[in-house]
């Protein structure tokens, strides 16, 4: 895992934040910001913070998919902010269909984006020892990697992701595009498998949520990842689909993140 830590690290940890817009609504403050993830990547993000109360937590809320999915989690971020957390939703993009080298590069950039987002949280007032990460689907994939390489995290939530997911989805994508599945591709997907990363000892508490009716990531894959994970960990399973977006699911995540 030392190689993974080097791959997902930067020599410098300073971050500069630019605010392009700000407004207040329903007891929270909304900001549109940009920051640098590395020397060549400028990231757009939404930051939601409490209005008129002390910040008790900092949380990154990472969307799934390969494009900007912040809109699916804005209400959840607002609810956590109303509970005392400052929440950042950074945009990440990954390209699983563009070959191994490009995919590895975009995964690295996405992980560096999430790590820089933690720096932004601290810069904007989050207590450094309270940092949390929540990731849905592909965002959960990033959360699994961060479990192994980001020591600042106090709590991690991974929902709707599991062991073997990257291998299954990337190979299916390759075949659907008419490309051959090579041994190099299989080895690369195996190296990035989530179960490998969550098995590393860490201080962060880990919550894994999964829906039994998830057609994208079978519940068995989520359970396999949970079984591989190091302690401390918690498993919550629901009679639901891939989204895990009901109020109960959101409340369980918020309770885990916001608990003192």
PLM feature spans:
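Short beta-strand/loop motif that positions the catalytic acidic residue
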Residues: 201-202, 208-210, 214
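Acidic catalytic loop of the alpha/beta-hydrolase fold
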Residues: 212-217, 243
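C-terminal catalytic histidine-bearing segment of alpha/beta-hydrolase fold enzymes
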Residues: 227-260
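N-terminal cap/lid segment of alpha/beta-hydrolase-fold proteins
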Residues: 9-52
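Short alpha-helix in the alpha/beta-hydrolase fold that links the catalytic acid
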Residues: 218-226
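Short substrate-entry loop that stabilizes the transition state in hydrolases
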Residues: 53-56, 61-96
């Amino acid at each position: 895992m030392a190689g993974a830590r080097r791959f997902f690290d930067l020599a410098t940890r300073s971050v500069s934040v630019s605010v392009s817009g700000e407004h207040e609504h329903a007891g929270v403050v909304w900001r549109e910001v940009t920051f640098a993830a590395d020397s060549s990547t400028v990231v757009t993000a939404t930051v939601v913070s409490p209005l008129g109360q002390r910040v008790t937590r900092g949380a990154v809320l990472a969307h799934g998919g390969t494009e900007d999915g912040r809109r699916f989690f804005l209400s959840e971020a607002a609810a956590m902010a109303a509970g005392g957390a400052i929440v950042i939703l950074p945009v990440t993009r990954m390209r699983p269909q563009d070959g191994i080298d490009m995919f590895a590069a975009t995964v690295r950039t996405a992980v560096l984006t999430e790590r820089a987002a933690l720096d932004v949280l601290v810069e904007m007032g989050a207590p450094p020892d309270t940092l949390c990460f929540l990731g849905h689907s592909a965002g959960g994939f990033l959360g699994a990697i961060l479990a192994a390489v980001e020591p600042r995290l106090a709590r991690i939530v991974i929902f709707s992701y599991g062991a073997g997911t990257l291998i299954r989805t990337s190979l299916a994508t390759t075949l659907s595009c008419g490309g051959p599945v090579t041994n190099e591709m299989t080895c690369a997907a195996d190296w990035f498998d989530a179960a490998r990363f969550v098995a590393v000892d860490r201080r962060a508490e880990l919550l894994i949520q999964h829906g039994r009716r998830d057609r994208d990531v079978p519940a068995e894959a989520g359970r396999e990842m949970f079984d591989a994970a190091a302690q401390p960990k918690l498993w919550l399973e629901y009679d639901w689909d891939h989204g895990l977006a009901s109020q109960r699911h959101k409340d369980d995540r918020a309770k885990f993140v916001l608990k003192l």
